[in-house]
Amino acid sequence: MHPRGALRPVHRRGGRVFRALLALLAAVLLGGCAIAVDSGGGSSGGGSGSSGTDSPIDSVNRADLDEDERGAVSATNAYWRETLPDDFRQSYRPPRVLGGYVGEDGPSCGGQPSVPFNAFYCPSQDFLAWDENLMAAGYERIGDAWVYLIIAHEWGHAIQARLRADQVSVAAELQADCFAGATLFGAAERGLLRFERGDTQELQETLAAVADDYPWTNESDHGDARERISAFNQGAQRGVRACLA
């Protein structure tokens, strides 16, 4: 999965290509497969994902990871810059993107410290941040779709903060998954990013990673694999309005 122009231009062939991708994604995801992506240092122990001596960030090509993070931010921002005014008739102001931190060195939100191996949106200060070790662990074991999905999901929480209260679901995490599906497939339809071979499999594995002990993939917070897959597919197949409460 790459931003437009990163490899070669996207050739627009209508909706058939993306409907085929969606059908493949649904067929694979609903098969009930779940994986565990460890941090590269054994059990994550109580959800911190910080055990072991080697950090996942040390095991990946930082330049490639940084490029995908920038690409995900760019495509997601461009999608919502068009979508919020067009679909919701309101002006769009992007959240701040503080980007990556490592371990316990992340920004605080409302006086609360950031959590290792997590990605989050801070509503009181309107910013997104993520632990680079979380990104690197999934990037190494799954692929770049991990990065795109996490950023699109957290951006979805920023969008929730911009909507009317009656448009925000009480199942906020699943609605953010729905927004992520609408974002990634909507951005691809518009030529803002391009899907590559294997991206649908990577999306499957990312959504199924609720078996992990990472805070970002905590089942009690985000829903089980089937709930997350269903929410993502709803947005991917039907667009952002299907995600509204």
Q: Predicted segment positions?
A:
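Catalytic glutamate of the conserved HExxH
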Residues: 147-162, 178
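Short, low-complexity, disordered segments immediately C-terminal to signal peptides
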Residues: 34-57
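Short pre-active-site segment immediately N-terminal to the catalytic Zn-binding motif
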Residues: 132-149, 164-170
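C-terminal motif of bacterial Sec signal peptides marking the signal peptidase cleavage site
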Residues: 29-32
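Catalytic zinc-binding patch centered on the HExxH motif and its immediate surroundings
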Residues: 38-42, 101-129
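An active-site-proximal "capping" alpha-helix that borders the catalytic cofactor pocket
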Residues: 81, 171-186
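Long, well-structured alpha-helical subdomains associated
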Residues: 189-245
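Catalytic Zn2+-binding segment of zinc metalloproteases
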Residues: 155-170, 183-188
